[in-house]
Amino acid sequence: MQVTDGCTLVIDTSYGSTVGVVGHEPIVETDSRTHVEKLQVNIARAMDAAGLGPADIGCIVVGVGPAPFTGLRAGLVTAKALAFATGARLIGQNILDPQDAMLRAALRGDAVIADAAGFLADVSHTAQNGQADGRPEPEHHITLCVNDARRKQLYFSLNHEAGVTGSETDSCHWIAMDIDYPGHIVERVNAEVRRRAEIGGMRYIVDVVGHGAARYADAWQSLDALGSVVEGSILDAGAAGLAMFAEMALKHADDEAPVEPLYLRRPDAEVPSPLKHVLNHAGAQRAD
């Protein structure tokens, strides 16, 4: 991980907006109608509260979604402009993978993140279930990470802890980031979890976390083995959540990779299909 001089500023507009300097409490706006207008003001407020100025920024971590177009674009444009003006390092971070890291910290009983995020209070620490003969059954928690996509859809990914299947290089995604309706997400998750359980002989518990998790709580009841349902984001967890989000971005940063938004949803405006060709019709001919 590259060491960055100066402070680290986090800007995310994947759901409302969150702005903060690592080591300090972030400023969170939940009103999606006004968060874009307040973004630059809140950046100035966050820097002032930390006793810092633009010249002190060494790194900017910006959320790249997945999220709806307008708000996400505003955050990316602002972060890129600020990085250009200050010479700060710019790193993009998706919003879904840190949700998994946050929930795993809560399952381990991490007091720092649990105390910072009241919405994690009901998350039970990892426990083992018994088999019929009394022997403990291997059990692992996997995370259905979600973010509200509006239109009754969710952005989501199905994450597991790398190495759980015996390979430290195993991807943390069992289902890569996508957008879908909650009912269909449940079908896809159940199918993948059953397939993995047959291969590994383990029992998997699915925890659901992110903005939109509570809204579709009824849908999650159809998951084969439902754990906790947590309505909240890592960026709702105060200074501790902000630091975890930035730490994850820095740990996995690729300075050669472009920082671009993850929209996932196809645009509403599409190129129209060509007109159907009419048999034996070559178009109107100009008369001589």
Residue ranges and their predicted role:
Residues 1-66:
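N-terminal beta-alpha supersecondary unit
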Residues 59-95:
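DPxDG-like acidic metal-binding loop motif
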